């Protein structure tokens, strides 16, 4: 019959190893002037020098859609918001390595890309772009980003 104490000890070792995973330092990134989000999340989160920027919509601090009907202006607003999160974490837009872009209408793709190119003039980050519905009907774009800003 196996020794129950040995099994319990082995389980404790496994649990202690797993607990170490949760001890990794994580920091919330909330730039000054940020409004209350619509759901339980923060604008950005940083761990091990990597900044994860939440899906960013063209909202003012009161969660109202700005620049209704203007995809270019909404894109600029979203990218400025992302820039604020990345800079609050100590980085720059040059540190952005990946963007996830969500559009409500492919007809806005060229306008979005024109503004996007202004924020990423040199080496471009990887990205994908999909068409989908967004949380508010007047929002035409949402972008989530990943940036590597170092330790």
Swiss-Prot record:
Q: What is its EC number?
A: 3.5.-.-
- Which molecular function term from Gene Ontology is one that the record holds? deaminase activity
Question: Which UniProt key words apply to this protein?
Answer: Hydrolase
Q: Which GO terms describe its biological process?
A: nitrogen utilization; uracil catabolic process
According to the UniProt record, one GO cellular component term is: cytosol
* InterPro entries in the cross-refs: RutC, RutC-like_sf, YjgF/YER057c/UK114
Write out the catalysed reaction.
(Z)-3-aminoacrylate + H2O + H(+) = 3-oxopropanoate + NH4(+)
Entry keyword Hydrolase: yes
Family label: Belongs to the RutC family.
Tell me, in a sentence or two, what this protein's role is: Involved in pyrimidine catabolism. Catalyzes the deamination of 3-aminoacrylate to malonic semialdehyde, a reaction that can also occur spontaneously. RutC may facilitate the reaction and modulate the metabolic fitness, rather than catalyzing essential functions.
Q: What is this protein called?
A: 3-aminoacrylate deaminase RutC
Tell me the organism: Stutzerimonas stutzeri (strain A1501)
């Amino acid at each position: 019959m196996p020794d129950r104490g040995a099994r319990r000890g082995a389980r404790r070792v496994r649990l202690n190893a797993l607990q170490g995973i949760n001890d990794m330092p994580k920091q919330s990134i909330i730039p000054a002037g940020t409004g209350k989000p619509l759901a339980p999340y923060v604008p950005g989160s940083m761990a091990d020098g990597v900044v994860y920027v939440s899906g960013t919509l063209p909202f003012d601090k009161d969660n109202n859609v700005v620049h209704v009907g203007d995809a270019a202006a909404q894109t600029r607003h979203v990218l400025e918001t992302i820039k604020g999160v990345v800079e609050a974490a100590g980085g720059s837009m040059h540190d952005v390595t990946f963007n996830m872009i969500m559009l409500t209408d492919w007809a806005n793709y060229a306008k979005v890309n024109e503004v996007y190119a202004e924020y990423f003039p040199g080496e471009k980050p990887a990205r994908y772009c999909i068409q989908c519905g967004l949380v508010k009907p007047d929002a035409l774009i949402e972008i989530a980003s990943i940036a590597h800003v170092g330790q």
